[in-house]
């Protein structure tokens, strides 16, 4: 549910009130499936610098014309968020249980993402708070609002996200943080002896008293299929095991400090292209939908944790 797929260019250009017009054909099948099968869906994402049409930011929605001013952009922002949230709530009540309101607004050095980000160019950092403000305004009270980002284990980025979330929490605009452990087998080195960076991140964000969602969890074996050796597949399985063991240990349900209410893997099967010509080996099932070693290690972490509790 990204702007690239929901914004209707022709209808928006013809809009009498100058506000954007959405079409929901691309997301209706998934929403309908979830509704019919009692499945909850994460709404991803209301505001992102990526996959938002360039024309959305320009006067008269014409890329040959200048960017609009901040006031106009804010009106477009509100209109878009209102349309998307209200469409889901009216037609699929109770299906979308949370929204990633803003995605990846902070760089690894802790600064705002300014380059190739028209939201920032026009509205500066105010666009983040405004997005949460309007999401809170139109979302039902039981729908949780999240800020979502990757590389959260980096100290400067971790601090910047913490400060942003604290500010939003003080204004009652945020319910949780989505943390994307989208990493390779060796970045960061998440083995049993060296997972302090992510552990520190979890415990730092726990101090905010917000929900923590693990989003886009994956450990990628980079390169072509020749790299998918038994050794690397085992290493991948070990990474999943260690991460799940850490999350179980840190969760408040198990006596830890972190209110971890969701763990989501990034996808289902290897080589199912997220982007065109972009194949990946990072998921729990292979390209033929057969469970990989990491599928079993993912489950084993939970079984081992349960066994350790029963033995006490």
UniProtKB/Swiss-Prot annotation:
Its EC number is 3.2.1.8. Pfam families: Glyco_hydro_10. One of its GO terms (molecular function) is endo-1,4-beta-xylanase activity. It catalyses: Endohydrolysis of (1->4)-beta-D-xylosidic linkages in xylans. Signal peptide: none annotated. It comes from the Bacteria. It is an enzyme of class 3 (hydrolase). SMART domains: Glyco_10. Gene3D superfamilies: Glycosidases. Keywords: Carbohydrate metabolism, Glycosidase, Hydrolase, Polysaccharide degradation, Xylan degradation. Pathway: Glycan degradation; xylan degradation. The active site is at residues 104, 216. Residues 1-301 form the GH10 domain. GO terms for biological process: xylan catabolic process. PANTHER family: ENDO-1,4-BETA-XYLANASE A (PTHR31490:SF90), GLYCOSYL HYDROLASE (PTHR31490). Belongs to the glycosyl hydrolase 10 (cellulase F) family. Could be a xylanase. This is Putative endo-1,4-beta-xylanase. It comes from Caldicellulosiruptor saccharolyticus.
